[in-house]
C-alpha cells in the first residue's frame, strides 16, 4: 500500500477511494476514484522494463485497437519502479460465458493486434527496443527453454522432467517457419479482454507484449476459451481471417501449450511456489498431458 500512496503523491492526485485489483498477477494495479468522481487505474509494474514496455505498446496501439489512455506517467524513484495512470474502459473482463458472436469479435481484434509490425523480434526496455540475438525467433524460443531447464528440474518429478526435455526436441523441430515480426500480447486471455453488452470494448495489460511471431499468442485463448467452449473456435478463426491469415494451429498449439506451461513452472518458482500453488498444479497437469506422465513431486 505504501507504493500506491507514493504514486498518488507524485502524480498529485486528489483521491476519494483506492481499491486493489486482485486479478493482476505480476504488477500491482489499483482502481482509484478521484474527487471529481472519475474512475482511473494506477499500474505499478514489477520492474522498470515492464513500465516502459506497457507505455510504448499502448502508445503504438492507441489508434489500432481499443486500449486504455495513458493519462500520466511516472518513472519512479528508489522506492517505487514507477507507474502508469490509465483511463477506465467501460466493460468487465470476459470471464463469463463467451458465445460465438463475441468469439468472432475477439478474433478480429487479436488479428488487428498481430497486423502491427515491429522493428524486429524483440521488446521494449527502458532505453529503447532491444532486438533478439540475430533477430532469430527460433533461436530465442530454444534459448528460453535452455534457460528454464535448471529451475524446472528443481520443481518437477525427475521422470516428468526428462520426458519434457525429450518432448521439446521433437515438437520444436516440427514447427513451421515463424511469421512476424509483429506485436504479440503474450497474455491474451479472458481476464485481459474487456466486454460490455457482448461487445469487446478494450484490451488491457501489455507489460509482456513484444515483437514476435503470432504463433505464440494463441495458447491462453485455446486453454481458457476454446477449451471451455469448443464452439467458439471456428468463429474466432473466421473473425481472425477477416484481417490476416491464421497460422497452422494444429502444429503450433501443442508446442506452445507445453512451452507456456514449462515457463509458468519457472514463474511460480521465482514468485513463490506456496502462494502460487494452484497455478503451479495447473501447469504441471498441462505438462503431464503434453508428455504423457502422471507423476509429480514439488
Language model features with spans:
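Alpha-helical scaffolds flanking conserved acidic
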Residues: 249-256
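Active-site acidic catalytic loop and adjacent metal/ATP-binding pocket
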Residues: 29-33, 42, 163-218
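Glycine-rich, phosphate-binding/catalytic loops in enzymes
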Residues: 58, 102, 202, 219-221, ...
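An alpha-helical support segment within catalytic cores of ATP-dependent transferases
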Residues: 2-13, 115-186, 241, 276, ...
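Short beta-strand segments
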Residues: 41-45, 71-72, 183-186, 204, ...
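Conserved N-terminal boundary motif of the eukaryotic protein kinase catalytic domain
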Residues: 12-20
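Active-site activation/catalytic loop segments of kinase-like enzymes and analogous catalytic loops
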Residues: 215-246, 258-274
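ATP-binding pocket architecture of kinase catalytic cores
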Residues: 19-135
Amino acid at each position: 500500500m505504501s507504493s500506491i500512496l507514493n504514486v498518488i503523491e507524485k502524480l498529485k492526485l486528489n483521491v476519494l477511494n483506492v481499491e486493489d485489483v486482485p486479478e493482476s498477477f505480476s504488477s500491482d494495479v489499483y482502481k482509484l476514484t478521484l474527487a471529481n468522481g472519475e474512475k482511473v487505474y494506477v499500474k505499478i509494474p514489477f520492474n522498470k522494463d515492464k513500465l516502459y514496455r506497457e507505455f510504448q505498446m499502448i502508445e503504438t496501439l492507441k489508434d489500432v485497437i481499443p486500449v486504455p489512455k495513458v493519462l500520466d506517467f511516472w518513472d519512479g524513484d528508489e522506492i517505487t519502479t514507477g507507474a502508469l495512470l490509465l483511463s477506465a474502459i467501460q466493460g468487465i473482463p470476459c470471464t463469463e460465458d463467451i458465445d460465438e458472436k463475441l468469439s468472432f469479435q475477439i478474433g478480429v481484434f487479436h488479428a488487428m493486434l498481430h497486423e502491427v509490425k515491429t522493428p524486429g523480434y524483440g521488446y521494449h526496455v527502458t532505453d529503447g527496443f532491444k532486438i533478439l540475438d540475430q533477430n532469430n525467433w527460433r533461436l530465442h524460443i530454444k534459448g528460453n527453454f535452455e534457460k528454464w531447464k535448471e529451475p524446472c528440474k528443481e520443481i518437477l518429478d525427475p521422470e516428468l522432467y526428462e520426458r519434457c526435455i525429450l518432448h521439446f526436441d521433437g515438437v520444436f523441430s516440427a514447427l513451421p517457419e515463424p511469421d512476424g515480426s509483429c506485436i504479440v500480447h503474450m497474455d491474451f486471455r479472458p481476464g485481459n479482454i474487456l466486454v460490455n453488452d457482448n461487445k469487446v470494448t478494450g484490451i488491457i495489460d501489455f507489460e509482456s507484449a513484444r515483437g514476435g511471431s503470432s504463433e505464440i499468442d494463441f495458447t491462453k485463448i485455446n486453454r481458457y476459451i476454446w477449451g471451455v467452449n469448443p464452439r467458439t473456435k471456428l468463429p474466432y478463426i473466421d473473425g481472425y481471417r477477416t484481417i490476416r491469415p491464421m497460422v497452422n494451429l494444429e502444429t503450433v498449439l501443442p508446442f506452445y501449450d507445453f512451452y507456456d506451461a514449462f515457463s509458468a513452472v519457472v514463474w511460480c518458482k521465482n514468485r513463490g511456489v506456496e502462494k502460487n500453488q494452484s497455478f503451479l498444479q495447473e501447469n504441471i497437469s498441462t505438462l503431464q498431458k503434453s508428455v504423457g506422465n502422471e507423476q509429480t513431486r514439488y
